[in-house]
Amino acid sequence: MYSKEMRIASYDEELETALTNEARRQEEHIELIASENYVSPRVLEAQGSVLTNKYAEGYPGKRYYGGCEYVDVAERLAIERAKILFEADYANVQPHSGSQANAAACLALLAPGDTLMGLSLAHGGHLTHGAKVNFSGQIFNAVQFGVNADTGLIDYDEVEQLAKAHRPKLIIAGFTAYSRIVDWQRFRAIADGVGAYLLADIAHLAGMIAAGIYPNPVQIADVTTSTTHKTLRGPRSGLILAKANPEIEKKLNSKVFPGIQGGPLMHVVAAKAVAFKEAMEPAFKDYQRQVIRNAQAMAEAIQSRGYKIVSGGTDSHLFLVDLVAKGLTGKAADAALGRANITVNKNTVPNDPQSPFVTSGIRIGSPAMTTRGFKEAEICELAGWVCDVLDDIENETVIADTKEKVLALCARFPVYG
């Protein structure tokens, strides 16, 4: 029998130290990685619950194991809340990640060797959108489109020309580093013109879409996939949505289970249910509006210091800083800002002369700092600090001074107060 008093701290000092240090890092660093956020204590509670003990292969009401009556409640809650949030007719909350969701969707819609089209990883796409190192570029014939080198915007005419030339069976509209509004209807028209399915990957956009402040593709695309963290502020996991189509729904379910997964992680499914309920609150819409305002304020402030912002700005939660003209690499910028307790990620920019391990840009996102409570005043101050470091990237005195300012700001806006 287990005692409820069993704790990591008194048993595993090495792991406890790592956990404590990570908690301190999150409190004392400003998180600007666009794909990261902080979940609520409620989400943490669900993810650490006894549901982790339960195996539940199958779907609610159709399990291969007994004793699933209560985990069925949790999964049904997550499904129904996801459908309401995203105005979907179908939802599968079992994928372990966004990549798993994309894998299931691709396998449901395509046969090996079929052609798919997606945005190049180097231009802001994702590994699962046809990158050669990923299943999507190995099992399928992947054709990649890019953004306009001058504007940083999707060239829909080029997408249409490529679609007509290659006749893909699936077009993926999804992004990890694209800052502007996506024209879902234009993608739909291009897909219809060549008889292709349309998959919308909203992993980065889900929170804004759920809040109703970014265009929703669910009733436009054949299938929509997402993560449940990032802007949605839930556990690190995946989600598949779709408009009504019984044939596709059946294929999606079978490709998730038993196609690519066994038992779902029921504690994570429960955490999704909590996060989806939180996303239904009026405060969540206010949060998402502030996410966009903060990203726009920061992009404008950095641009005013002479740095190039890809596409000239942002309509969402993220933007790319192109460092080519400054003679800096993303790797060096990432490291210098990290020493100042500002966490970003190096990122390729369109037509990047550097390798993906070095890059010529950094990606900046506002979800996590907005969760802390930052608004425009703090954002403009922070943008100045970022530029101070980048302007004199080898000056450790500037970096140390910036770190002290960051620590003071973090103390004013704790993650978990």
From Swiss-Prot:
<comment type="subunit">
    <text>Homodimer.</text>
</comment>
<dbReference type="GO" id="GO:0035999">
    <property type="term" value="P:tetrahydrofolate interconversion"/>
</dbReference>
<dbReference type="InterPro" id="IPR015422">
    <property type="entry name" value="PyrdxlP-dep_Trfase_small"/>
</dbReference>
<keyword id="KW-0663">Pyridoxal phosphate</keyword>
<dbReference type="Pfam" id="PF00464">
    <property type="entry name" value="SHMT"/>
</dbReference>
<keyword id="KW-0808">Transferase</keyword>
<protein>
    <recommendedName>
        <fullName>Serine hydroxymethyltransferase</fullName>
        <ecNumber>2.1.2.1</ecNumber>
    </recommendedName>
</protein>
<dbReference type="GO" id="GO:0005829">
    <property type="term" value="C:cytosol"/>
</dbReference>
<keyword id="KW-0554">One-carbon metabolism</keyword>
<dbReference type="InterPro" id="IPR015421">
    <property type="entry name" value="PyrdxlP-dep_Trfase_major"/>
</dbReference>
<feature type="binding site">
    <location>
        <begin position="125"/>
        <end position="127"/>
    </location>
    <ligand>
        <name>(6S)-5,6,7,8-tetrahydrofolate</name>
    </ligand>
</feature>
<feature type="binding site">
    <location>
        <begin position="355"/>
        <end position="357"/>
    </location>
    <ligand>
        <name>(6S)-5,6,7,8-tetrahydrofolate</name>
    </ligand>
</feature>
<feature type="modified residue" description="N6-(pyridoxal phosphate)lysine">
    <location>
        <position position="230"/>
    </location>
</feature>
<dbReference type="InterPro" id="IPR015424">
    <property type="entry name" value="PyrdxlP-dep_Trfase"/>
</dbReference>
<comment type="similarity">
    <text>Belongs to the SHMT family.</text>
</comment>
<dbReference type="InterPro" id="IPR001085">
    <property type="entry name" value="Ser_HO-MeTrfase"/>
</dbReference>
<dbReference type="InterPro" id="IPR039429">
    <property type="entry name" value="SHMT-like_dom"/>
</dbReference>
<feature type="site" description="Plays an important role in substrate specificity">
    <location>
        <position position="229"/>
    </location>
</feature>
<comment type="pathway">
    <text>Amino-acid biosynthesis; glycine biosynthesis; glycine from L-serine: step 1/1.</text>
</comment>
<dbReference type="GO" id="GO:0004372">
    <property type="term" value="F:glycine hydroxymethyltransferase activity"/>
</dbReference>
<dbReference type="GO" id="GO:0030170">
    <property type="term" value="F:pyridoxal phosphate binding"/>
</dbReference>
<feature type="binding site">
    <location>
        <position position="121"/>
    </location>
    <ligand>
        <name>(6S)-5,6,7,8-tetrahydrofolate</name>
    </ligand>
</feature>
<comment type="function">
    <text>Catalyzes the reversible interconversion of serine and glycine with tetrahydrofolate (THF) serving as the one-carbon carrier. This reaction serves as the major source of one-carbon groups required for the biosynthesis of purines, thymidylate, methionine, and other important biomolecules. Also exhibits THF-independent aldolase activity toward beta-hydroxyamino acids, producing glycine and aldehydes, via a retro-aldol mechanism.</text>
</comment>
<keyword id="KW-0028">Amino-acid biosynthesis</keyword>
<keyword id="KW-0963">Cytoplasm</keyword>
<dbReference type="InterPro" id="IPR049943">
    <property type="entry name" value="Ser_HO-MeTrfase-like"/>
</dbReference>
<comment type="pathway">
    <text>One-carbon metabolism; tetrahydrofolate interconversion.</text>
</comment>
<dbReference type="InterPro" id="IPR019798">
    <property type="entry name" value="Ser_HO-MeTrfase_PLP_BS"/>
</dbReference>
<dbReference type="GO" id="GO:0019264">
    <property type="term" value="P:glycine biosynthetic process from serine"/>
</dbReference>
